Amino acid sequence: MPKVMLIGYGNPLRTDDAIGWRAAGELSAQLTGDDVEIVACHQLNPEMAEAVAQTDLVIFIDACTDGTPGRVSRREVQPAAFSPELMSHHLDPESLLACAKELYGHAPKAVVICVTGECFGFGRELTPTVERVLPGVLELARGLMKKPAPKAKAAKTVQ
């Protein structure tokens, strides 16, 4: 079972809302091993609670609308107070942690990495503003997971 779970979420068809998907995809290509599970999804839902409860750390990566576009913030989150109303079709990180704790007896340490988006209109590419901060988001996530950055591959010489 993975010790770390990274969940990148948002709408991959709404420009900067895809930052969680992009980060999850790039980290998935860079990291290997049984100690990390990486998930890209449209939204958080109660069905994720069991997998979350089986980890030591969960990292959420999402877009937000408040602040200056391209701003990256990090905050630790705690489980919300549990109530049956939390069991809706989609959750915020605090509610997902509450479900994990209530249903499976454990809520791991949790961190949200949020990137302020510039555009949430229809589109499949990040804006240049958000694209520029993606490497920093990946570095922050790897640091939280205690995973070093991948080494650059040496360029092939063609003669």
Predicted features along the sequence, with ranges:
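Short "lid" loop at the C-terminus of a central beta-strand within the Rossmann-like core
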Residues: 118
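Glycine-rich phosphate/diphosphate-binding loops and the adjacent beta-loop-alpha structural elements
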Residues: 121
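N-terminal catalytic or cofactor-binding beta/alpha core of small enzyme domains
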Residues: 1-115, 124-136, 140-159
